[in-house]
Every structure is written in C-alpha cells, then in structure tokens.
Amino acid sequence: MPRALWTAWVWAVISLSTEGASDQASSLSCDPTGVCDGHSRSLNSIPSGLTAGVKSLDLSNNEITHVGNRDLQSCVNLKTLRLGANEIHTVEEDSFFHLRSLEYLDLSYNRLSNLSSSWFRSLYVLKFLNLLGNLYRTLGETSLFSHLSNLRTLKVGNSNSFTEIHEKDFTGLTFLEELEISARNLQIYAPKSLKSIQNISHLILHLKQPVLLLDILVDIVSSLDYLELRDTNLHTFHFSEASISEMNTSVKKLIFRNVQFTDESFVEVVKLFNYVSGISEVEFDDCTHDGIGDFRALALERTRYLGNVETLTIRKLHIPQFFLFQDLSSIYSLTGKVKRVTIENSKVFLVPCLLSQHLKSLEYLDLSENLMSEETLKNSACEHAWPFLQTLVLRQNRLKSLEKTGELLLTLKNLTNLDISKNNFLSMPETCQWPGKMKQLNLSSTRIHSLTHCLPQTLEILDVSSNNLDSFSLILPQLKELYISRNKLKTLPDASFLPVLSVMRISRNIINTFSKEQLDSFQQLKTLEAGGNNFICSCDFLSFMQGQQALARVLADWPDDYWCDSPSHVRGQRVRDARLTLSECHRTAVVSAVCCALFLLLLLTGVLCHRLHGLWYMKMMWAWLQAKRKPRKAPRRDICYDAFVSYSERDSYWVENLMVRELEHFDPPFKLCLHKRDFIPGKWIIDNIIDSIEKSHKTIFVLSENFVKSEWCKYELDFSHFRLFDENNDAAILILLEPIDKKAIPQRFCKLRKVMNTKTYLEWPMDETQQEGFWLNLRAAVRS
C-alpha cells in the first residue's frame, strides 16, 4: 500500500510539472516574424520550447530568478532579449553563449550581485547592454566588456550599492553613443577609468555628491560631446581651475537634470563654462536654486562671459526663496554672447529692461508657460531691448490684449517669428500694429472667434488652429503656410485670398466636401491636411477623391483620416473604400430610364387593355363598387316595373312591336322598362341601368348575336350579374331570340355562359303555331 501511494505521488508531481511547463509555453505570444511577447505574465522561469525562429524575446516584468545554460541555447537567431524587472540573481556562465546574433540585451532591475565577463564573451555583435538597478558593488574582477567591441549603448550601476569604478572596468570599449552610469553613492573613482573610451557621444551621470565630479570630468572632457548630470546636490561643488586648465576639451553640451544649486555653487559652475571652452549649450531641467540670486562673487572673479555658451535652456526651475530673489544685475554682463534662451514653466513674470538690453546677441527667446502680462512685457521689451531678436515665444502666459501686445513689440525691429498661442485674447480688433518684418505668427488656442485686418500683411506662416473660427476671408498675399485645424470652418478658404499658399492644414473642422476645382484654384498648393472632417460622400466627391492618383501626394493624412459621415449606409467607412449604388450616382439617367420604362409599361398596359377589354373591366369594377353600396333589394313599394328588358338596338323591332304588344297590351297588362322609352334624360346611363334593374321585378335578356356585340348590353348583363345572379335568385329571364354558339361568347361573358349552361331559357320559335305557347310561358315567368 505505501508503494502504491508513493507511485501516485510521483505521477502527480510529474503531471503538475508538465502542466506548469505547458502553461508557461502557452503564455508566450509570437508573431510570424519571430517576435515573442511574454512580459508581465508572472513567469518564474524562462519558458521551454524556444526555437531558432525566435528573433525577439520579451520576458520583462516577471518573476524569473535564474537563467540556465540550456534555457536559450536553441535561440541561435535571437537579436533582442529583454529580461528587465525580474528577480534574477543567478546567470550561469554559458547562458548567452549560443546567442551570437544578439544585438540588444536588457538585464536591468534584477538582483544580480556579481557580474561575469564570461556572459558576454560570444556576444560580438551586441550593441545595447543595460545592467542598471542590480545589487553589484563593482563591475567585476576582470574587464567585463573587453569582447564587446561593437557596443554602442551601455547602462551600468545602481542608486545604492554601486560604489566603486576601477581603471579596468571599461577596457575594450573605444566608442559609445550613450553611456549611463548610476552611481549616487560613488565612493571610489580610479583615475583614468573612463579615459580608455576614446569617444563618448552622450554621458549620463547619476551622482549624489560632487566630490568625484571633477575627477571624472578630467578623464572625459577630451572625448565627450554631451554630458548630462542627474540627481546631484551641488551645494558643496567647488571648481578647481588647475584640474582642467591644460586639457583639450570637446564637450559641447551640458545638462543639469534634477540638480540643486546655491548661489555659491552656481558661480563655480559658471567658472567651469569659461574653462571648458567647447560648451555651447547648457540646459537646466527641473533644478532647484537654493539661494537669493546673490552672484556678486562673479564680479570679484572678473568673469565677463558664460564662456562660449550660445544656447541656454531653463525648464521647471524651483526657487524656494522666490520672493527674496535679487534683480540679477550681477549677471547682466555675462549674457552678451548668448543667442538662444529658453526659460519655460519657471514663474517668470518680468525680464528687466537692463537685462534685455544686455542680451545684444539674442536671436531666439522662449518664455513659455510663465506669468508674463502686457504690463511686464512693456518693461521687458523696452527701447533697445533684444536688438537682434528674431523669434519670440510667449506661449501660455497671461496676455489678454492682442492690440496692446503688438504695440509693445514694435521696439523689436528684427522680429520675424512670434508665438503667442494659448493666451486668452478672446477677440481680435479691426486694426493692429506689428513689427515691420513679421513673417510668422502663432495664434493657436487663443479662443478667438474671427479674423480681422489686425493680422499683418507680411505674414508667410499663420497658425490659428484650435480656435472658434467659422470662416476665413482675409487677403494675405504673401502667406505660404496656413494652419487652421480644429475650428468650425464649413468650406476651404477662397484661393483668391491666398495666391501663394503651399501648405494648408485644415483638419478637424466641419467641412462636408471639397472639389477638384477648389484644389486646382490653389495653384501652388503642395501639402493639404484635411482629415477628421464630416465628409458627405456624394458621388462627385468619391469620384474625385478615389480617382485622382496625384491627390495622395498632396493629402498628407490620406487615407487614414478621411471618413464618411453620410449617407448613413456608408457612415464610418473610409472615403477611399466607400461605394455608392448606381441609382445614387446616376440619378438623372436612372430617373430617365425609369420614366421610359413606365411609359413603355403604360403603353403596353394600354394596348393590353384595348386588346383584352381592360377598360371595360375597370368601368364594370367601378359600377360594381357603386352598386355594392346600394341595398341588396329594393322595398316592394319601390318596384315600378314588372320587368326591365335588356336588348340590342338591332333587336328593337322584335321587342317594341312584338314583346310590348304581347305583354303590355295583355289583360291584365305588364309594365315593362325599356331604355329608349323609360330612361331619365340627363342622367348617367349606368345609373339609369342600375336604377331600372333595381326598380324592376324581373330582368328580361333578349339574347342574340347582336346582344353579345352590344356595349350597353354588356353593361346591363354585368349589373344583372352583380344584383341578380350573385344573389342566386330567379329574377333573370333569358330569351334566346336566335341560336348562339356558346364558344362565340367572349370570355368576359363567362357568367352568361354559366347561366346558359345551368338555367332554363325561353327560345323564340320560328314556327308561328308555337309562338302563342312562347308568350304564355313568358307571361308566367314574369308573373312568378
């Protein structure tokens, strides 16, 4: 029994293991190109079953703890491997040995406490390696990257435990496009550790304290293009002139990101600019200045310029003692060579007039997302301020008057490009004054409702997108580019207003359609963006849009942003794919064809009616409907005649001379109704027939060949059908005046043939000796 339990337990474990492997394999999703995605799947190991067809494998953000020698041995064509954000603490020596095609390897944010050069010894073509966020203190006992001669991007270090950089660490690396070192707690930096790298395009350095900053800078200053310093507290930074005074520097750009300064340390940084003479661009991003702007030490140091810095960018500058900040007069003299300044989202409400006047080389000024108003702009753009300024960006400030803003900028004689978007102007005056060289104006998102002659006639580029405009009727003879998206325009602007327009972006309006003629009227138009409108996909519009191959070269957003809004059956379809029916696109032709068909049908119906007596049937139907409305039987007091006689005019002699004599002159006499004698003059014949039949006790039909051919006899017989035969009574008396071939009776007299087959009729005898008996039988039938 214990043996059986043991066997069952073993099989259960094997079954669970198999299911686990199967579940892990199924957790990968791979496309036909060999890209497999397994990130965020709670995997605790690398899935089995990987093949040579896998070229990209993403296993990031899982719970993998170990990478074994055989886990990836089949992935010989793998180029990208992402293992970041796992729990990996062990990587076996030959784990990546078979990945000779690997170009991208991410092992960041795991739990690796030791790094081994054997991992990378066969990765000759590796270009990207990320080892950030692990637990190692150093980069290993031997040179870790000596085999990675093609490496271009390297990220190493962590924010806590990485404390040492040694001279051998980067041996073998000669050129890197990007090197990121996270060493917030760096304690040891061996001189010349980075000097072995002959060229570094971009170095990102995370340092908490600046103690070793100059030592690092000395090693890289001659091989680095772009230095980015992050998360550093420069309160204690002190620049030593002797450190780099004799170095041939190549650094061109310097970025401080999330760095803290004091007044004193800022002075030291400015001194650095003067000695690292290659720096032409400096950026401060999300930095904090713990001071009050007391830079008098710069004057004592006789610092006259910011080195060769021409571009200065400041974003999200935090000044805790903002209301104690001084007037910056001590740095005015340093700004003479600066050509481009960006101060964004830093609560700037004023640029002092003296500072503006000292910015004699300034060509570009961006003061976006600040607190500038017309009152402070008046002081900033004072006389002789920014004499060479060409571009001014005042986006998202507190400007409210377009007219006043234009007047205040008249002092800027060389201004050509003005961005005052995202200010609340609301309206536009009829006239304005602007600098005489204005060519570009950005008024997007300013909530204006209409455009007036306030706009300068010299404009070549105008952006009025994201407003409330419903029309564009301005003449701008030099305008080349118009950006008017996200408004309420219903049609394209008139081309005669914009004779040299080459670019127009008019998407997200309420335009229903445009035509070939409209586009052709813009003779120099090269780019049109008109997607996102509510297009009515008419036949003409679809024919134009789908039939012009050259149109695709003009429409920048074709075909993905062009959708039909109507008709309803094509709503939601792309204009390129919409199809209308023949009747919708050729309405005139279809209507003409239908009319012709109806005419032919009517003509055919008329012919058939004539040949098949259709008109007669319609008349009878109408008479029948009229007769149906009358009472089924007339009251006895309304009976005026003993019999109504239906006969052909050609048989009138027999009726009027023989029948009348034998019936009306008999004693007692019978009263007959004859149409020639008793019909009421002026009354419709059909009404006379109906009334006479209704007021007669019997109806006598004098049947003959003439009767069958008589039109009125047909009417009388039909009405007798409706009133007499349909009621199944004996009010009808048939007299066969002469023999009739039943086959000769027309089809419309079907009831006559039926009656002659089912009812007894009186036949007029040609023998005079039998005629007396005929009259006796007729009188008896009328009297019954």
Curated annotation (Swiss-Prot):
GO CC terms: Golgi apparatus; membrane raft; phagocytic vesicle membrane; plasma membrane; receptor complex
Keywords: Cytoplasmic vesicle, Disulfide bond, Glycoprotein, Immunity, Inflammatory response, Innate immunity, Isopeptide bond, Leucine-rich repeat, Membrane, NAD, Receptor, Repeat, Signal, Transmembrane, Transmembrane helix, Ubl conjugation
Annotated localization: Membrane; Cytoplasmic vesicle, Phagosome membrane; Membrane raft
Bilayer topology term: Single-pass type I membrane protein
Principal localisation: membrane
GO biological process: cellular response to diacyl bacterial lipopeptide; cellular response to triacyl bacterial lipopeptide; inflammatory response; innate immune response; toll-like receptor signaling pathway
SMART domains named among the record's database cross-references: LRR_BAC (SM00364), LRR_SD22 (SM00365), LRR_TYP (SM00369), LRRCT (SM00082), TIR (SM00255)
Annotated LRRCT domain residues: 525-579
Gene3D superfamilies recorded: Ribonuclease Inhibitor, Toll/interleukin-1 receptor homology (TIR) domain
Matching InterPro entries: Cys-rich_flank_reg_C, Leu-rich_rpt, Leu-rich_rpt_typical-subtyp, LRR_dom_sf, TIR_dom, Toll-like_receptor, Toll_tir_struct_dom_sf
Molecular function GO labels: NAD+ nucleosidase activity, cyclic ADP-ribose generating; transmembrane signaling receptor activity; triacyl lipopeptide binding
Glycoprotein in keyword set: yes
Span of the annotated motif ATG16L1-binding motif: 761-778
Extracellular side stretches: 21-587
Quaternary structure and partners: Interacts with LY96, TLR1 and TLR6 (via extracellular domain). TLR2 seems to exist in heterodimers with either TLR1 or TLR6 before stimulation by the ligand. The heterodimers form bigger oligomers in response to their corresponding ligands as well as further heterotypic associations with other receptors such as CD14 and/or CD36. Binds MYD88 (via TIR domain). Interacts with TICAM1. Interacts with CNPY3. Interacts with ATG16L1. Interacts with PPP1R11. Interacts with TICAM2. Interacts with TIRAP.
Description of its domains: Ester-bound lipid substrates are bound through a crevice formed between the LRR 11 and LRR 12. The ATG16L1-binding motif mediates interaction with ATG16L1.
Protein name from the UniProt record: Toll-like receptor 2
Gene that this sequence comes from: TLR2
